[in-house]
Structure formats: structure tokens, C-alpha cells
């Protein structure tokens, strides 16, 4: 049975269901859960339920009152999902607020607030974030523009730096707001294989090869192979195991 497509231009409302393509331009609302091969929105888009899509692309203001499950997602603007987010590949540029995130490749450039863990193969965060759980991935890359917080960081390779990795907009905005260059990450623990950290405040850091760079304040470092500590960092205790 062929799936039909729906389109809203201007202001409108459609019922949830299973579709081929959903396209909303303007102010649109979907009442109930929706599943589509392709979901595109530009403007103010609200889903009163959960959304499952193959390709997901929105710009403007998007809100889902349930969960979000996509294969490939691109978001620009305001992004709010009440439930969990699952994606093979997800790129967000703007302000995002959601439940736990799980996926393959996750990139957020802007401001992120996640109620739960972020678990993926690769996580790249640029800007400022607050993650109530842990950030866990094979590769974690963080570029801090402002004060950020997570419970724990875990991964094979973890790198934390100040500054913007994915363009100059956040850097320009940070300078205008007076927060540029003040990025710092607060966590309880960092654990991985190769760790390269700057401007991290942590109770404990555990790794095989560890670099504690400028701006770090760490209570205890446990390392297996090598440890490098910057003179501009503070470490309470160093333990080789």
C-alpha cells in the first residue's frame, strides 16, 4: 500500500499517521504520532506526539511532545523534544532541549540541555551544554564557548578545548555577550583511553595516556602509561597504576 504525502503552507493542522513525505512551511501542527520517510519543516512546527522519520530536516522552531527517532537529521534553530532522541546521524545548530540522546554520529553546535545520557559512536559538542547524565562515545570532541556541565565523560578518545570548532558564529556571539573564551567544563569524572583535556574541572580523571592542559583543576589523576600536566593546571594527586 502506497503511503500518501502531506503538505502545509502557511498555517494548518494535520492528523498523525504513516506518510511518505511530510512538508510544513509556516506554522504547522501534527496531532498525534507520525511516521514518515521524509519530514521537512520550516517555520514553527509542533508534533503532538512522537516522530519517526528516515530523513528529518527542520529550520526555525521545532517541538515534539514525545520521542524522536530518525536515521538522518539536520536541525537549524530551536529544537525541543520532550522524550528521548535516537538518530544514526544528527546535526543540530542552535538551541536544543531534549531527553536522553542515543545514536551513531551526534553533533551539536550552540546550546544544549539534555535530560539524561548521551550515548553514541561519535559526539561533537561546540558551545555550551548541560547534560544531566553521562556523555559516552568512542570519540568525544568538545569545544567550549561558555560554562558547561555533565555528570561524567567516557570514551576511547576524549578531547576538550576552548573555542569553536564548527564556524565563527558562536565565537562572534560569545564576544558580543562577553562570554567568549570563558568556557569551562565541570564533571565528576572523566574516564577513557586517550585523554586530552583543557579547562576541565573534575574530581577524578582515569586513562591510559593522559594530558591535563591549561585551566584544568583535577582532584586525582589515575593513569596507566603516561601523564602530562601543564604548569597552568592544578592536580591534587597523581597515581600510576
Predicted regions: what they are:
Residues 1-241:
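Extended beta-solenoid/beta-helix repeat architectures
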Amino acid at each position: 500500500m502506497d503511503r500518501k504525502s502531506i503538505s502545509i503552507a502557511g498555517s494548518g493542522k494535520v492528523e498523525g499517521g504513516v506518510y511518505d513525505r511530510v512538508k510544513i512551511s509556516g506554522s504547522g501542527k501534527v496531532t498525534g504520532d507520525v511516521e514518515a520517510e521524509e519530514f521537512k519543516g520550516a517555520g514553527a512546527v509542533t508534533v503532538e506526539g512522537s516522530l519517526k522519520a528516515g530523513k528529518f530536516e527542520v529550520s526555525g522552531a521545532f517541538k515534539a511532545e514525545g520521542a524522536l527517532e530518525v536515521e538522518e537529521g539536520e536541525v537549524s534553530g530551536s529544537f525541543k523534544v520532550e522524550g528521548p532522541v535516537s538518530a544514526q546521524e544528527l546535526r543540530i545548530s542552535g538551541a536544543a532541549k531534549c531527553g536522553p540522546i542515543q545514536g551513531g554520529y551526534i553533533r551539536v553546535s550552540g546550546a544544549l540541555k539534555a535530560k539524561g545520557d548521551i550515548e553514541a559512536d561519535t559526539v561533537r559538542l561546540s558551545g555550551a551544554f548541560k547534560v544531566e547524565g553521562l556523555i559516552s562515545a568512542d570519540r568525544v570532541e568538545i569545544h567550549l564557548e561558555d560554562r558547561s556541565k555533565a555528570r561524567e565523560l567516557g570514551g576511547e578518545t576524549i578531547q576538550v578545548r576552548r573555542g569553536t570548532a564548527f564556524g565563527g558564529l558562536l565565537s562572534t556571539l560569545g564576544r558580543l555577550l562577553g562570554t567568549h573564551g570563558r568556557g569551562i567544563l565541570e564533571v565528576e569524572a572523566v574516564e577513557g583511553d586517550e585523554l586530552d583535556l583543557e579547562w576541565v574541572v573534575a574530581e577524578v580523571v582515569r586513562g591510559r595516556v593522559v594530558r591535563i592542559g591549561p585551566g584544568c583543576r583535577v582532584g586525582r589523576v589515575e593513569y596507566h602509561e603516561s601523564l602530562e600536566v601543564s604548569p597552568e593546571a592544578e592536580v591534587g594527586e597523581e597515581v600510576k597504576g
